[in-house]
């Protein structure tokens, strides 16, 4: 298997709700907008998609919709399929593969605090259950669990279909260290604030929250960097500074969904508890920053 298979500009899709249910029509439109604006892959049912509060049926439906909309296009589907129960992560990975997803994004197990050996066995079981590409997802600020550099490298070398890691630890030194020890690995930025530093230090793509709103700019930034045109990439990165900052003024995905609502890209500003709408102050701040950007709606 070619380990370079899912890289480039990728969007961590929000999940729009309406009257307490997944708004499937808006969801489909959002994916089509991504396709039309140069995104290389979409990631349904991940952190930004509020996977923790989706039912199992809703989670699977989000994957199915993404696969159906992307069918026949160049845009790939990297399905969110993580769990802190290995058997459930395996079941999700199998479902995603059987229903046409191009790859799997699997977050580190949260809450139960596995050892590094436990993490290794968890991911090995997932990788052995499917023959599609698997991207590890390291986000210790949310999971309370750090996948060590040694564990990431061992999994990459031992499991043919584990092709890299989405790094959302905010630790640039770790990212540089990973590539120094295993330059074949596909390092993917998982934080919009450090997309440019990661791409300019050997990263091969981004999984972006901001690209829900500005897919064309994130695509351009990513591809300029991959083409080693760092001057143009940095120029776009600088233009995105204020929006990247405000989109994390509260817990993701609260600000990005708010911005999408303000832009008229989703019909209803709904969250699943314990997530809730932003404060009035932050709503106003998001609205003010957005005035500086030209958002292309439906």
Swiss-Prot record:
One of its GO terms (biological process) is lysine biosynthetic process via diaminopimelate. One of its GO terms (cellular component) is cytosol. Pfam families: DHDPS. The record marks 47, 111 as: Part of a proton relay during catalysis. InterPro entries: Aldolase_TIM, DapA, DapA-like, Schiff_base-form_aldolases_AS, Schiff_base-form_aldolases_CS. The active site is at residues 137, 166. It is found in: Cytoplasm. GO terms for molecular function: 4-hydroxy-tetrahydrodipicolinate synthase activity. CDD domains: DHDPS. Pathway: Amino-acid biosynthesis; L-lysine biosynthesis via DAP pathway; (S)-tetrahydrodipicolinate from L-aspartate: step 3/4. Belongs to the DapA family. Catalyzes the condensation of (S)-aspartate-beta-semialdehyde [(S)-ASA] and pyruvate to 4-hydroxy-tetrahydrodipicolinate (HTPA). Homotetramer; dimer of dimers. PANTHER family: 4-HYDROXY-2-OXOGLUTARATE ALDOLASE, MITOCHONDRIAL (PTHR12128:SF66), DIHYDRODIPICOLINATE SYNTHASE (PTHR12128). This is 4-hydroxy-tetrahydrodipicolinate synthase. It comes from Campylobacter jejuni subsp. doylei (strain ATCC BAA-1458 / RM4099 / 269.97). The lineage of its organism: Bacteria, Pseudomonadati, Campylobacterota, Epsilonproteobacteria, Campylobacterales.
């Amino acid at each position: 298997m070619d380990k370079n298979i899912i890289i480039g500009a990728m969007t961590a899709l929000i999940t729009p709700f309406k009257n307490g249910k997944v708004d499937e029509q808006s969801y489909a439109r959002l994916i089509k907008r991504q396709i039309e604006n140069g995104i290389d892959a979409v990631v349904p049912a991940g952190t930004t998609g509020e996977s923790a509060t989706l039912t199992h049926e809703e989670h699977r439906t989000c994957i199915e919709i993404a696969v159906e909309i992307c069918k026949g296009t160049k845009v790939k589907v990297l399905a969110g399929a993580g769990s802190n129960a290995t058997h459930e992560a395996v079941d999700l990975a199998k479902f995603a593969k059987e229903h046409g997803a191009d790859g799997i994004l699997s977050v580190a197990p949260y809450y139960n605090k596995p050892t590094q050996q436990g993490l290794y066995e968890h991911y090995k079981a997932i990788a052995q259950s499917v023959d599609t590409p698997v991207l590890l997802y390291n986000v210790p600020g949310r999971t309370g669990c750090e996948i060590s550099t040694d564990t990431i490298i061992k999994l990459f070398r031992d499991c043919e279909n584990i092709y890299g890691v989405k790094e959302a630890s905010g630790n640039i030194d770790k990212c540089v260290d990973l590539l120094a020890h295993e330059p074949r690995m596909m390092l993917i930025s998982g934080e919009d604030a450090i997309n440019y530093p990661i791409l300019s230090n050997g990263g091969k793509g981004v999984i972006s929250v901001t690209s829900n709103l500005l897919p064309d700019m994130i695509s351009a930034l990513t591809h300029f960097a991959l083409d080693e045109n760092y001057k143009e990439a940095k120029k776009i990165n600088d233009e995105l500074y204020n929006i990247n900052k405000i989109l994390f003024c509260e817990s993701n995905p609260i600000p990005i969904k708010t911005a999408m609502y303000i832009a008229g890209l989703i019909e209803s500003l709904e969250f699943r508890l314990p997530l809730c709408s932003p404060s009035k102050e932050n709503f106003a701040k998001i609205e003010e920053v957005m005035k500086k950007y030209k958002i292309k709606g439906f």
